[in-house]
């Protein structure tokens, strides 16, 4: 009788060990790769890249068709409020008038999601800006994050800039005294 109980106990131990090992092996499998299924992402990504390319070449007129007339821009300055089309165009012109050798080097481009985590065709990017101030000659460099939302026509209808815009301007205007 004792031998039978030991065999039953060993079978239970073996089955439990087998279940634990199986669960471990299953849990170690790689998660499926997330693929952007939003058909607008590639087109919107090309628009965002073109927007930066035109900013780097200081071609505001060529940028304008990429921007929705109802755009909302969230600038990177302390205490700033969202601006609409005219403020956005003026801000871009201000950067271009006050800086030369403007470059944005994107480190990564990513698809964006809505508030529920669903891929929505929006575009995000992390990168580094550098430029030379025309008044002081100071060269500035700053890491940045930008997010773009697009309308049905593929134009930028919301742009959010995240970087230290106020500190950047202070560095650009600093004197060497």
Feature roles, as predicted:
Residues 60-115, 119-121:
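A solvent-exposed, acidic/Ser-Thr-rich amphipathic alpha-helical stretch
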Residues 28-57, 61:
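Short, low-complexity N-terminal intrinsically disordered segments enriched in polar/charged residues
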């Amino acid at each position: 009788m004792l031998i039978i109980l030991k065999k039953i106990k060993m079978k239970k131990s073996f089955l439990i060990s087998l279940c634990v090992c199986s669960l471990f092996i299953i849990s170690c499998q790689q998660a499926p790769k997330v693929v952007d299924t939003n058909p607008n992402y590639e087109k919107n990504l090309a628009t965002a890249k073109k927007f930066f390319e035109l900013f780097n070449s200081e071609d505001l007129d060529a940028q304008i068709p990429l921007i929705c007339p109802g755009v909302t821009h969230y600038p990177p300055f302390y205490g700033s409020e969202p601006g609409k089309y005219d403020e956005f165009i003026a801000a871009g012109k201000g950067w271009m008038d006050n800086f030369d050798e403007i470059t944005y080097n994107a480190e990564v481009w990513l698809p964006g999601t809505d508030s529920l985590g669903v891929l929505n065709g929006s575009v995000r990017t992390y990168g580094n800006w550098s430029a030379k101030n025309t008044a002081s000659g100071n060269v500035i460099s700053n890491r940045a994050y930008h997010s773009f939302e697009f309308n049905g026509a593929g134009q930028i209808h919301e742009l959010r800039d995240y970087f230290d815009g106020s500190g950047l301007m202070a560095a650009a205007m600093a004197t060497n005294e």
